[in-house]
């Protein structure tokens, strides 16, 4: 497989995420292909740094200077850097990649090469658990949210943004298919390759189209879960007081594309339009 497939950076999400609202305050709270930065969606003229925006929003939900933070999906450490810069007293980073934390080290930061589905970390130790553009890669969403809840202190805040969701127009994350919505849901592997050949799609950033398609269809990198499964997995967390558990995003005009019409033969529109799942909650006990 491709040498950097599992190092999924966050920059691709700039093209797919809607501008978020002001963060909700929870009750009781004070693979080996790196997707590249894409242009703003049609109708947007300004590029938003969603990573920085969401770390800032999450930090405002706690007393960050006296808070311990766990970043789930820390990658090489940039999200951890953001929380250190915001003044967090301690930041731990969790990821499955060998290079976890390679780009940022700090005396207040520790990294763990583990999956959020099951860790050996101590329970009830974090004031804030932050996950951005990560849960769509986690096979067992329920196990991931359950583990986050276990690791939170009572009164601690969970802030999770999963995007783009698999069933959304570009849930495969590959920019070379931009303008060809839901190609990954309409066709199987051979069909995608045939469609790419017919439409002059050759791959991206030095990776040929065969490697790109094999990567985006690999369950090791994408969980292929429906948007409803995120809502259900979050709602089943009995120790969390939930401020937000919702779906947003999606451009309904994409359904007018021939691929949009084709995907509607298999899915309802409400199953394929949502791009983002947001979970913001406080641990009650």
Where are these regions (language model features)?
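A short glycine-rich, Lys/Arg-flanked "PGG" loop and its adjoining helix->strand segment in the class I
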Residues: 142-157
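Conserved class I S-adenosyl-L-methionine
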Residues: 66-75, 157-200
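A short SAM/SAH-binding and catalytic strip from SAM-dependent methyltransferases
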Residues: 128-140
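A short acidic, Gly/Pro-enriched loop at the edge of an enzyme's catalytic core
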Residues: 117-129
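A C-terminal cap/extension of S-adenosyl-L-methionine-dependent methyltransferases
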Residues: 3-4, 107, 210-211, 216-285
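Conserved alpha-helix/loop element of class I SAM-dependent methyltransferases that forms part
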Residues: 47-66, 82
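Class I SAM-dependent methyltransferase SAM/SAH-binding core
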Residues: 75-118
């Amino acid at each position: 497989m491709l040498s950097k497939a599992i190092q999924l950076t966050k920059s691709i999400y700039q093209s797919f995420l809607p501008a978020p609202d002001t963060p909700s305050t929870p009750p009781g709270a004070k693979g080996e292909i790196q997707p590249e930065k894409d242009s703003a969606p049609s109708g947007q003229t300004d590029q938003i740094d969603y990573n920085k925006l969401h770390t800032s929003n999450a930090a405002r939900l706690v007393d960050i200077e006296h808070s311990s933070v766990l970043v789930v999906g820390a990658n090489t450490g940039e999200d951890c850097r953001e929380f250190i810069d915001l003044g967090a007293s301690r930041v731990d980073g969790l990821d499955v990649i060998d290079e976890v934390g390679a780009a940022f080290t700090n005396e207040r930061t520790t990294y763990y090469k583990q999956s959020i589905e099951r860790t050996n970390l101590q329970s009830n130790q974090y004031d804030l658990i932050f996950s951005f553009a990560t849960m769509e890669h986690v096979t067992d969403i329920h196990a991931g949210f359950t583990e986050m809840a276990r690791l939170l202190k009572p009164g601690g805040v969970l802030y999770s943004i999963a995007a783009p969701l698999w069933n959304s127009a570009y849930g495969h994350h590959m920019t070379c298919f931009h303008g060809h919505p839901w190609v990954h849901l309409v066709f199987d592997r051979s069909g995608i390759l045939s469609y790419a050949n017919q439409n002059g799609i050759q791959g991206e950033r030095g990776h040929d189209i065969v490697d790109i398609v094999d990567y985006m269809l690999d369950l090791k990198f994408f969980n292929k879960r429906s948007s409803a499964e995120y809502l259900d997995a979050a709602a089943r967390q009995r120790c969390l007081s939930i401020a937000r558990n919702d779906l947003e995003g999606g451009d309904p005009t994409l359904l007018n594309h021939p691929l949009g019409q084709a995907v509607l033969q298999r899915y309802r529109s409400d199953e394929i339009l949502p791009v983002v799942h947001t979970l913001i909650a406080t641990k009650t006990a």
